[in-house]
Amino acid sequence: MSVPLILTLLAGAATFIGAFLGVLGQKPSNRMLAFSLGFAAGIMLLISLMEMLPAALDTEGMSPVLGYGMFIIGLLGYFGLDRLLPHAHPQDLVQKRQQPLPGSIKRTAILLTLGISLHNFPEGIATFVTASSNLELGFGIALAVALHNIPEGLAVAGPVYAATGSKRTAIFWAGISGMAEILGGVLAWLILGSLVSPIVMAAIMAAVAGIMVALSVDELMPLAKEIDPNNNPSYGVLCGMSIMGLSLVILQTIGIG
């Protein structure tokens, strides 16, 4: 099994960590969840804008028009799907968790699971494509994806467990979203394995960079602010950027990058 596929599997499996936290009652503080989301956004922004997009543009034979065009397609594609596909957000469950409406909570959790699955699927593809092009960047993307999968698993499993009383059901529904990400990675492994053209991989990587930027600014940062409105998510973003940037420098210095 290839390393990029393993990274994708591990990133998707992080959803189960949140699911177990949701059913065991050991919920992390809102401040910690918000910081982790900001941290993940910082990693994604730095890698997308400072590494993935420049690497795609520097590929031999890649024109700036195609490179930036694919980046914009990734941006607009994410925003378009996010607006067209009705889905709930994790904060919806956080707000409804205190309401004595178990059936309503369960329905919302199921809708949330389906919505998260829809955007986790391309994340699995993005993780695999990035790791296939540059293993160093793949580690960073996998870490960022895993960090924001944990609160997603928690947001689904906790309310479902409260509504049904079944830990197995709660973990099942939370795990579906993680499995969607793994499925995306597996399909990318099966389909993209035959696409050996560097230009094709560079174009896909530019589009993935656009998706990651959109995900960071439209999903992760606003969600971090809603979970913990008393603290600025920018601290987590800056911390994620700084640590990721430092790690990239260290890896390149020792010859791994």
From Swiss-Prot:
Membrane topology: Multi-pass membrane protein
Record's subcellular location: Cell inner membrane
Residues annotated to bind Fe(2+): 120, 123, 149, 152, 181
Cleaved signal peptide residues: none
Reaction catalysed by this enzyme: Zn(2+)(in) = Zn(2+)(out)
Family: Belongs to the ZIP transporter (TC 2.A.5) family. ZupT subfamily.
Binding site for Zn(2+): 123, 148, 152
GO cellular component, as recorded: plasma membrane
Role noted for this protein: Mediates zinc uptake. May also transport other divalent cations.
Listed GO MF terms: metal ion binding; zinc ion transmembrane transporter activity
Disulphide linkage map: none
Classification via Pfam families: Zip
Residue intervals passing through the bilayer: 5-25, 33-53, 61-81, 109-129, 137-157, 171-191, 195-215, 236-256
PANTHER family in alphabetical order: ZINC TRANSPORTER ZUPT, ZINC/IRON TRANSPORTER
Protein name: Zinc transporter ZupT
Organism of provenance: Salmonella paratyphi A (strain AKU_12601)
Keywords: Cell inner membrane, Cell membrane, Ion transport, Iron, Membrane, Metal-binding, Transmembrane, Transmembrane helix, Transport, Zinc, Zinc transport
Top-level taxonomic group: Bacteria
Coiled-coil annotated residue ranges, if any: none
